[in-house]
């Protein structure tokens, strides 16, 4: 049964043959309808994506994925109509994969003629089937050629009124699995005297907290030691700050998820990156890990530099 998505509908497509050891998705459809964007989303979700592989190479790639020790368990291949034998090529791939007990899912991307014309005119590109004809004629020829493919597709996505974000959400619901639910967050402590982290999405300065450096028994220790952590987190306002900042980050992470961003680096800085920033980073990681939708790691950039 074909699933048809227009605008913000709910996918999800049929399940692939998990017993075969590799899941295969063939992304096809009308030129300009968003095949490349769909492929990029699949890549972000951890799929191995190949663009316009010849049919015989698709089956070889699958064989490689089935081989012992291969890390390719999800393969997405973008197929277009550069070859006049495209429909036969797709049937050939399906038949070859069937001999390996694999039933690929076919995603068909489409859009209205008006929207396709607008996209081509905005990008000032010619249609692959246009030749010496008009753009509208090229689109019509492709639509007719792909009618048999569309009729047997597992998932049809109409991008006429879909934003990039909307397309991403539909692809994630259909093919994301656990990967679509996980955002990777790195909490990085650092010392301002060594410079700001270049890869930070957010930077927080915790130099407003008293510095354990001026406590003789704490000076040789780091924020990873319990005594330093207790000292830093026990200062007035420290626990309130930590809780409030955690709530703020939770809102930001959800915003990142809605925008399709799956990676985030939060930098926590103090003077030398040894005491306060380390203690706060460790405590923040503990709070963030309570969210099962996050994959959280901690990095202490400047620890040990003194």
UniProtKB/Swiss-Prot annotation:
GO function terms (MF aspect): ATP binding; GTP binding
Claim: Signal is one of the keywords in the record: no
UniProt keyword annotation of Acyltransferase present: no
Binding site for GTP: 80-83
UniProt-annotated binding residues for ATP: 29-36
Swiss-Prot/TrEMBL keywords: ATP-binding, GTP-binding, Nucleotide-binding
Transmembrane residue ranges: none
Entries under InterPro entries matching the protein: P-loop_NTPase (IPR027417), RapZ-like (IPR005337), RapZ-like_N (IPR053930), RapZ_C (IPR053931)
Similarity comment: family membership: Belongs to the RapZ-like family.
Function summary: Displays ATPase and GTPase activities.
HAMAP family tied to this protein: RapZ_like (MF_00636)
Protein name per UniProt: Nucleotide-binding protein MMAR_2228
């Amino acid at each position: 049964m074909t699933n048809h998505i227009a605008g913000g509908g709910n996918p999800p497509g049929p399940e692939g043959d998990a017993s075969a050891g590799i899941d295969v998705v063939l992304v096809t459809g009308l030129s300009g309808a968003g095949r490349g964007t769909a492929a990029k989303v699949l890549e972000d979700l951890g799929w191995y994506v190949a663009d316009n592989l010849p049919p015989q190479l698709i089956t070889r790639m699958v064989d490689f994925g089935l081989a012992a020790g291969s890390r390719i368990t999800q393969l997405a291949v973008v197929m277009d109509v550069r070859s006049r034998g495209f429909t036969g090529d797709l049937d050939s791939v399906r038949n070859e994969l069937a001999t390996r007990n694999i039933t690929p899912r076919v995603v068909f991307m489409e859009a209205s003629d008006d929207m396709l014309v607008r996209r081509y005119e905005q990008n000032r590109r010619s249609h692959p089937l246009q030749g010496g004809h008009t753009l509208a004629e090229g689109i019509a020829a492709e639509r007719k050629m792909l009618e048999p493919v569309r009729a047997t597709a597992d998932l049809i996505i109409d991008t006429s009124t879909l934003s990039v974000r909307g397309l991403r959400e539909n692809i994630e619901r259909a093919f994301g699995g656990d990967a679509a639910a996980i955002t990777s967050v790195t909490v990085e402590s650092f010392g301002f005297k060594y410079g700001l982290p270049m890869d930070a999405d957010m930077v927080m300065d915790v130099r407003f907290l008293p510095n354990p450096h001026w406590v003789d028994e704490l000076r040789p220790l780091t924020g990873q030691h319990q005594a330093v952590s207790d000292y830093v987190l026990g200062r007035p306002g420290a626990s309130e700050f930590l809780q409030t900042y955690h709530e703020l980050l939770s809102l930001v992470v959800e915003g990142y998820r809605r925008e399709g961003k799956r990676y985030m680096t939060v930098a926590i800085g103090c003077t030398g990156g040894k005491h306060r920033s380390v203690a706060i980073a460790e405590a923040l990681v503990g709070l963030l890990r309570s969210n099962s939708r996050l994959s959280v790691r901690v990095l202490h950039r400047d620890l040990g530099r003194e």
